[in-house]
Amino acid sequence: GSNDFMRF
């Protein structure tokens, strides 16, 4: 998604 950078 557009917030994939929040996946740790």
Swiss-Prot record:
Organism per entry: Sarcophaga bullata (Grey flesh fly)
Subcellular location, principal: secreted
Higher taxonomy: Eukaryota, Metazoa, Ecdysozoa, Arthropoda, Hexapoda
Sequence similarity: Belongs to the FARP (FMRFamide related peptide) family.
Protein name, as recorded: FMRFamide-7
BP terms from Gene Ontology: neuropeptide signaling pathway
Keywords noted in UniProt: Amidation, Neuropeptide, Secreted
GO terms under cellular component: extracellular region
UniProt entry tagged with the keyword Secreted: yes
Keyword Secreted: yes
Intracellular or extracellular location(s): Secreted
Location of Phenylalanine amide modifications: F8
Source superkingdom: Eukaryota
